[in-house]
Each structure stands twice: as structure tokens, then as C-alpha cells.
Amino acid sequence: MTGDGMRLARTFLASFLVLLLEIALIRWMPAYIRLLSYFSNFILLASFLGIGIGCLLAPTRSRLFRWFPLVQAAVIAAVYWFRLELSVPTAGSIYFSSGTAEKVVLVESTMLLPVLFVIVAALFATLAQRMGREMAGLPPLRAYTANLAGSLAGVVTLGVMSWLELPPTVWFGVAFAAALPLLFTADQPAAEPAAQGAMGAPRPALLRGVVVTPLVGINVALLAGSLVLVSVMARGAIWSPYYKVTVSQKGPDTVVEVNNIFHQSMAPLDQKEYFYEWPYSAFGDTFDNVLILDAGSGTDVAAALRHGVKHVDAVEIDPSIIRLGRELNPDRPYSDPRVTVINDDARHFLRTTTRKYDLVVFALIDSLTMQSSFSGVRLESYMFTVESFANVRDRLEPDGVLVVYNYFRERWLVDRLANTAAAAFGEEPRVHVHEARAFLGVLMAGPRLAQLTAPPRIPDQVTAFNQSHEPSPARMHQRDPAIEPASDDWPFLYMRDRHVPQHYVVALAIVLVVSALSVVAALRVLGRGTTGGSAGWSWQFFLLGAGFMLLETKSIIQFALLWGSTWVVASVAIASVLTMALVANAVVARKSVTRPWLVAAVLVGLLALNYVVPIGRVTFESRAAESIFYALLVFSPILCAGLLFGSAIARSTAVSRDYGINLLGAMVGGVGEYLSLVTGFRALVVVIALCYIGAVAARVRETGVRQEVRVGG
């Protein structure tokens, strides 16, 4: 293999390792550090900062990659020794804690998150410097193509491992194997000569660049030790595509925990809370067809079967929870021939099914995790929007009813759901709550409420796993209409109102300060200063990165609305974005981009179309036609963005530096996503458009003249 061929292979391998490890950490760390299930975006931002800094430092003589095994071992050891439960002192948003304070160290989130941010950023800086050096030794477009291909391979590999439900030992084992060839080859700036043998003679082709030193041996041992520690931590757990799942027996209950938090318990129906059977207590055994969303291990299904329903569709997103329900639920509901178990996202099923139901149950829907690493939306957020409740209304029979029950924890959350139901159904829902039981509430809405002329007495006793048996009288709930319902544009169910929580503000401010200082330090190491107009900085690449990160986030959210919030959809969405970037790169390699302003104008026009045509606005009789229409709507801006970046990188005289600046911009774009907590997601389209307009303006300013870009691939 030629020198360029070897460098191309190492670029691919380094890019593969970077993205594989990035997604692996985003999945693995929240399984032990609880709050990261809701703040996984911080790991993503840290990785972008580290990759950006590492690429900026690619031309320097320092060899950061030699520290990669040690830093990775430190990250894994820190998670092992300090499995932290974070307290978030706020009533303005809801986070779920494990209730196992005796087993964890309590720390304040705004102090720990920046520490984790720095450690993870340092890890990716060691990797990215090596990746940047390999890219710098190649023609710009070939380097970027290899980078995209390696990244795509990383996404696909972890997706396959998730599909197979393989444990983290395998994830990190694949990363270990990918790191070995890089550890055993020379790590040097592209401008330095190839490694030589004794007395200055060139090495044989097969051994050229191969390095074997005591340090390499130590690093291999560190990687092996890290792998052993990961294996020890994963022992006894089931790794579903969404969580670390553990099962234990506590008295008569089989308890399921996900990411160290109580998720559900399995016990005979007679020992469970009354609300499972409340719809049948209120309306009698009059339901024929029932839909249960988030069916879990099957208790809600068992209740429906006890009361004589003819058919139950049980929808559950997590295949491992379904298996546990089949094997361990003492009532064996999933073995009943009247039950159809559907492994799907509940909102996607609502949008795509044509069946009608007498009863739709939202069964204790709490995901305890995020939709994807690229957004702050929780997995279940789109189930509790006005649009989702409208989907339920359309799936009800003329005398059907929706029932929602849960431990809502705050009064304002009950108000939000009641207001959402009122907006979707056009009539008042019926809601009762037990304030002394974490606002346990039952909400009913739909035309069958008109039949409830003499409702039964609500039980005072709430029998629940690991809770007090003291009486807790219920009261009817009068909703506060001032609490805003959640919508597909603003789906933040667990936030009282539109604001950026203070703990986010503090943590993000620290993150931005750390990032700014890191960039300044990196630029000074390069000897290029930090003042505006410095030759070492490109606002074009920075704005392209910020815009693309926001565009990717928007696209993944649109994907979830259209095809569901499953891990498959999230993986396909990320892979599709990378594929579109590869397609754009191929186009640029074959045809010059002579009018970047024209491409930007088309991009802005497509963004405007995305703004005025949200997912679901245009309906089709054919699901295939709907999918094609919205796929084109979502992906066409990404193609234009890829053309702009591809044409810019083709003209770069320092590809690793400009790619690093681009990743730093992406990190800032990730911070900008938190604006959606105030504005909603549609408003981000305006920010994306401004980023790309600014990038094209910066391109003209930085080059001094608009010129045709000709690329020889």
C-alpha cells in the first residue's frame, strides 16, 4: 500500500474510533452517572471541543495520542469509583433520582458537569490530534471523505451492537482493537519524514512506520485494564438499546431498575396500585379493544385481561423490557392469545395504525432517558403534546376514552396534562390526584366521560412498592389554565414554563469559558495569536460548524416525529446525515461550486419551507408518499450545507486546523440548542439560516474575492 493509502486508512480508522467512542460514552456514562441521562448533550459538547482542540494542535510536535490510553483509563476509573447521584435543586423542572442515596455520593450538578466536560474533552483531544495529523497529509477532499466514511462506519458498528444488545465490554473492545494499529504506528506531523531503520536506512515496506517501545506496551496494558474494569461494572446487567437494565427480587416483587433507577416492579395484579383497574371500575367491563402505550412488563395488560377485553395491543419501545415481562410477570399477560405485543415507539404507532379503540391507556410513561445524544428531548416527550393527544382522539371509537395515570410529582405537571387534554379534545378532562403520594393522578378524557354520571368512590389506600401504606385521600383537580400545554414545537413536558434553568445556565457558562480558554491556549501554541483577523482562525468554518450542528439536531427531531423515537431511528438519522455529507462531498469532487451565495440562497429557501411545513402539516393517504416527501424536506438542506462545507474544505490550506475550527463551531451550536427551551424548535431554523448566511459572507471576506473552486479528487 502506498504512503497516501496508509494515511487514508489511518484517517478512516482514527475517525471510526472517535465516533465509536463518542457514542459509546454517551450511552455508557449515564448508566452510572444518573444526571447524564438528561444531560448527555454535555458529553457530545465535550467531545466536539476535544476534537476541535486536537485538530488545531495537529501541526505541533507534541504527541497527545500517547496519552489516550491513560486518559481513557482515568475516565473509566472515575466513573467506577465515583458513581455519582446528582442533586438538582429546582421545582421548575423534574428529574428522577435513584432513591439510593446510601450507595452514591451526592454532589451539586453544576460543579460536576464541568469537571466531566474537561475530562472527556481531554480524552478526545488525544484522539483528534492523531486524526488531524493523518488528515493533514492528504488532499483536503480525500481527507474529509475518509473522515466521513470512518464516522459513518462508527455509527453503523455501534448500531449493530445495540441491535444485538451487546454489553459495553464489546463496545470498548472494538475501540481497543481500532486503537491498536494507531498505537503501533508513528504519530508525527504530516510534514515530518517517514520513519527509518537503523543507520538512517528506510524500513521495509511492511514495517515502515511501526513503533514498538516500552510506552506502547504500557499503553496496551492500560487499554486492557480499562476493558477489564468495564466488564466488571457491566456484570449482571442487561444492556438494552436504551438502558442498563438490572433485575432483583425484593419480597414478592420482581424489581426492574434502569440506569440504577427504579423503573417498574412485577407482582400479582392484586398487590398493585388501584389505578391499573380504575378505567374498569369507572366504566365497568365494557371495553372490547384496548391500546396500552408503554406497556412495560405487562401489569396494565393483565388488568385489561382480567376485565374481559377481547383484544389488547400492547406497545413497548424496549425489547428487553418485553422479554422480562414475558418471562417474569406472574400474571403472564403476554402469553394470552388476546394480546398483540408491538415493539415500537408509542407516538409512531399512534400515527400509523388504522385501528380504533374503546380505551387508550398511557401506562406510567417515564422513559428516564433522552431521545438521542443530539437533543435535549426526553424519549417520551412527544407522547404528551397536544398533537399526540389529538392522534389519540382520532384513534378512539365514538364512545372511547383516554386514561393517563402516573406519579406526576408536581401540581403544575398535572395542570399541563389537563390543559393539553382540554386543547386536544375540546372539553374538560376529569382528573383526580393524591397529593401525599407524589401527586399520583388519573386523567380521563374523551366522549365516554358523558356516561360517567355516578363515578365510583376513589380509594384512599394506594398500595405501591416500597411506599407508605398510610391512607392518602384523593381530590378532584381543578386545572390552572395558565400552564402552557406541551406541543411538538415545544415538547418540554417536565419544565414549568419557557426558560433556561439556572443550573443549565451556570454549567453552560462554565463550559463556554473553559472552551474559550482552551481555544486561546491552542492558538497561542500554534503561534498565531488570538486577535480578530488572525490567520489561524476562520469564521467561515466556525459558522458552518454551528449551523450544521443545529441543522443535524433539527433533522433528528423531525426524524423522531415522523418515524418514532427508537434507537434505530436515531441511528439511521445520524447515519443519513453523514451519508448526505458524503454525497455532497462526491458532488464537489466532480463539479466546482462557483456560486456559494446561490447554494446558500437555496439552503435558506429550504429552511423557510421547513419552517412553514412542520412534520404532519401535509398529510398523505400513502405512508410511502408521506415518508418520501418529509425525507426530502428534511435532507435537502443537509445536502446544501454539505456542498458549502465541501467546497470550503477543498480550498483549505490547513485542513486539520479548519476542521478543528468547524468542530468548535459545532460545539457552540450544541450550546445554542438550549435556546429551544425558550423559543421552541422551529425558531432554531432562523438561527441556522443566519449561521449559513454569515459563513458565506465570511468566505468572501476571508478570500477577498469570489472565485471558482476546482477540485481534483
PLM features: residue spans?
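Alpha-helical transmembrane segments of multi-pass membrane proteins
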Residues: 1-713
